């Protein structure tokens, strides 16, 4: 068994310093990861003559992209905390079995999803609202991206196991390397080689492939604390079952983004037309600047909470949670204020169309009005995961999007003359309600969860 050189740090190190060491690289990685899609959209939106239609087409692929991410995190977000808890209990053998089983699951999922989505994507794109013009661009992008699904799942699903060991910088470099390659290749493939939308997809797949190689080399190398071994890749239900049970809440959160995207697009298309749908495409990208860094903060806090929970150190678990909690709230509150004051600056990144910039700026102020409360909800819900509370985490994951937001998108327009305003208003209403319920639930159960572990 390898010596856990990071154990003393997790058990005795300064909590704020640990969170900074683990969260900052994770946040940077999440922001850079966001560039994969944002850079594609910015470049595609500026393709001469076809930019608007091409951007719309690529946007229609978003629900499928979200589902691929959801399946990757089903394994990664559930397996990594389980591995961290095992490490906290000094059971590295179990932690390595979890790593091996999760890798096998990701490979299997990649094969199945590639086949299913490659065959069904044209039909799905039509259901999402693709026209004869936009379907061409959507299909061109989708087919190439889907063929690279294996690399996407490996990068998203296995990188969490690097972070959970305390190697946050290595984890960050996975994303940095891929994003830099993508940013360099995008203009070459799109403009220089004249590949257009196909070039954007190919650049993304190649950059993800390099990231996957980086991860696998590290996890099979000498520096890792948990090594990926063939002997641990044989699936055992008792090993991967608890991982999937824990990861299901993240899967639900991410997969419902797909349904949410379809709900917003269909309603806005009905009440506001193309300009409203275009504004939503911009808003979706900007909103990820809130949610992805939050995930990074919680990814940094998760190993600290999980490890000390497994090591039966409740005081350090509490301190880690409250440090993470306050950080999330400060970030979302600050972002909310910036968007309220400078919405046009954000909208103008994605388009030079004055009408769309004005419309998107108006919509942003409505949509983001409750974004400050997301810090409460995400921090508490993710902390339930870090503590191994899969059922509660799943319920709270369902609350905001499935129980509240999606129904409100269709209900609120019945009570307002401005139907588009009502559709956008559904977001802050659901944000605030979900955050209130989640925060109360967490603080009600937190102490009892810690006592049960004694």
Predicted feature residues:
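N-terminal transmembrane alpha-helices
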Residues: 10-50, 63-78, 82, 107-114, ...
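Small-residue-rich hydrophobic transmembrane alpha-helices
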Residues: 55-115, 152-171, 279-343, 374-393
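Transmembrane helical elements of multi-pass membrane transporters/channels
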Residues: 21-40, 144, 178, 207-211, ...
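Short alpha-helical transmembrane segments in multi-pass integral membrane proteins
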Residues: 1-25, 83-150, 192-247, 305-370, ...
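Short runs within selected transmembrane alpha-helices of multi-pass transporters and secretion channels
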Residues: 145-163, 171-179, 200-213, 295-299, ...
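Small-residue hotspots at the loop-to-helix junctions and early N-terminal turns
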Residues: 52-63, 138-142, 201, 272-289, ...
């Amino acid at each position: 068994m390898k010596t856990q050189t990071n154990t003393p740090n997790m058990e005795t190190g300064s909590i704020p310093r640990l969170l900074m060491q683990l969260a900052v690289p994770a946040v940077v990685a999440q922001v850079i990861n966001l560039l994969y899609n944002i850079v594609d959209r910015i470049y595609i939106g500026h393709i001469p003559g076809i930019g608007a239609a091409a951007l719309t087409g690529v946007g229609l692929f978003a629900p499928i992209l979200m589902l691929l991410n959801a399946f990757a995190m089903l394994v990664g977000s559930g397996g990594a905390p389980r591995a961290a808890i095992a490490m906290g209990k000094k059971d590295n053998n179990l932690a390595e079995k979890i790593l091996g089983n999760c890798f096998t699951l990701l490979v299997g999922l990649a094969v199945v999803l590639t086949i299913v989505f490659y065959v069904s994507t044209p039909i799905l794109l039509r259901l999402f609202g693709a026209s004869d013009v936009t379907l061409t661009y959507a299909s061109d992008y989708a087919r190439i991206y889907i063929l690279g699904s294996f690399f996407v799942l490996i990068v998203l699903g296995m990188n969490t196991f690097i972070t959970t060991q305390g190697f946050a910088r290595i984890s960050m470099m996975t994303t940095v390397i891929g994003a830099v390659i993508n940013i360099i290749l995008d203009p070459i493939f799109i403009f220089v080689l004249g590949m257009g939308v196909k070039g954007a997809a190919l650049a993304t797949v190649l950059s993800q492939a390099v990231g996957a190689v980086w991860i696998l080399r590290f996890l099979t190398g000498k520096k890792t604390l948990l090594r990926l071994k063939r002997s641990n890749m044989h699936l055992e239900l008792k090993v991967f079952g608890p991982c999937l049970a824990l990861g299901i809440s993240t899967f639900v959160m991410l997969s419902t983004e797909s349904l949410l995207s379809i709900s917003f697009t269909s309603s806005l298309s009905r009440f506001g037309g193309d300009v409203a749908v275009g504004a939503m495409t911009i808003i979706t990208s900007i909103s990820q600047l809130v949610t992805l860094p939050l995930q990074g903060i919680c990814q940094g806090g998760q190993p600290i909470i999980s490890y000390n929970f497994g090591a039966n150190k409740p005081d350090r678990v509490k301190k880690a949670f409250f440090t993470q909690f306050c950080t999330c709230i400060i970030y979302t509150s600050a972002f909310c204020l910036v968007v309220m004051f400078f919405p046009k600056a954000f909208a103008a990144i994605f388009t030079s169309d004055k009408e769309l910039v004005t419309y998107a700026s108006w919509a942003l102020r409505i949509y983001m009005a409750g974004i400050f409360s997301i810090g409460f909800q995400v921090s508490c819900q993710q902390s339930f995961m870090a503590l191994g509370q899969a059922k509660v985490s799943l319920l709270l994951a369902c609350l905001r999007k499935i129980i509240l937001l999606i129904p409100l998108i269709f209900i609120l327009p019945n009570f307002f003359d401005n139907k588009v305003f009502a559709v956008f208003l559904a977001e802050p209403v659901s944000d605030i309600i979900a955050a209130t319920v989640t925060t109360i639930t967490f603080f009600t159960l937190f102490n009892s969860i810690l006592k049960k572990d004694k």
